[in-house]
Every structure is written in structure tokens, then in C-alpha cells.
Amino acid sequence: MPLWILKMTKITKLNKKNFFIVLLPLSILLSLVFNPIKVNAEIAETEINGELMNASIEFLRDLDFETWQLVTYKSPLAEDKLILRVIGYPGNLRIDHPTNLQVDSGRKRWFLSDKTLLNVDLANDRRQAAAEFDLDELINNIDKNRPLRLSLSGVFSELPVPPFVVKEWRSLS
């Protein structure tokens, strides 16, 4: 066999070896980039107002990088309506009541009524770092898990809520 044919087969074997060494990690990387791991929200049994109930609990940051806890649950105090509790860190703010929560999604806008004073535990809490809102109207008016923006006058100007959280809220209703 001529020498040039032997050299050619050696080069093609090297190319095949390098091809698989480079191609396999590259294909794995591309599959992770274009098919990201899904983030699933969780509904857990939580103690709220002294009772165990299913609730969605998420920590989100507003555009000022302040962290807020959003707890959504069906309240036995409010005729089993879906309630959204917004909790800030005590000492950082004071939420005056009643204050409606503005919710925006695209061109649509909702104002959720403040239900904080109906909850005796929150009404008597001196820290005043939490507020509760009637989420039923919003959940009944949306048919998709769309991203939302929450605004609470004097507290935060915009708190983005991702679609997976909205999906979790809708599953509670």
C-alpha cells in the first residue's frame, strides 16, 4: 500500500476521534441551552393563621432588588377566596391599609382589594410588614400563565411575577 494512503487513513482516524471528543460535549451543551431545565413551583402545606393549608410560597425581588415573600392560599376567613399575602422585612417599611395592589400584564390592569384588616392577626401586628389582597378576581380573569407586574403605592413600584408562579396560583383556585 502506498505511503500516502496510510497517512490519509491515519489522518481520518484522528479526525473521527477528535470529532467525537468535540461533538459529544457540544451537543450536550446545546441541548441544555435550547431545552433548559423546567422550574416547577411548589405548593406545600403551610401553617397560616394557626391552620395547616395548601399554599404557594415564593420569594421574588422587585426592580430595586428588595426581596418580597408572596404567599397565596385559600382563606377560610374570606369565604375560601384566594388570598395573596405580600410580606416585606419588618423595619424596612410600613404598609398602610387599605391600599389596593395594582397588577399589570401587557395592556391589561387589575386593582386587587386590600383584605389585610379582615385578618385579625395581621391587623394587630405592630410590624405592619404584610398585606393581603383578594386574588380571585385576577385569577378568574386570566386564562394563561402570563407574566405579571405588581405595584403597591408607596411600597414598591414594580415586582415582576414569572409565569410559573402564576401557574401555581391558578392551580390553587
Q: What is the role of each PLM region?
A:
Residues 106-156:
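Short, solvent-exposed, Trp/other aromatic-anchored flexible loops in extracytoplasmic proteins
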Residues 35-41:
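Sec/Tat signal peptide C-region and signal peptidase I cleavage site
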Residues 94-100, 113, 161-163:
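Short, hydrophobic/aromatic beta-strand segments
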Residues 42-77:
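Low-complexity, acidic Ser/Thr/Pro/Gly-rich terminal tails and inter-domain linkers that flank the onset
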Residues 64-102:
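Short, surface-exposed binding/anchoring microloops in extracellular/periplasmic proteins
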Residues 160-173:
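Short beta-strand elements
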Residues 20-34:
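Bacterial N-terminal signal peptides
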Residues 4-24:
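Bacterial N-terminal signal peptides that target proteins for export
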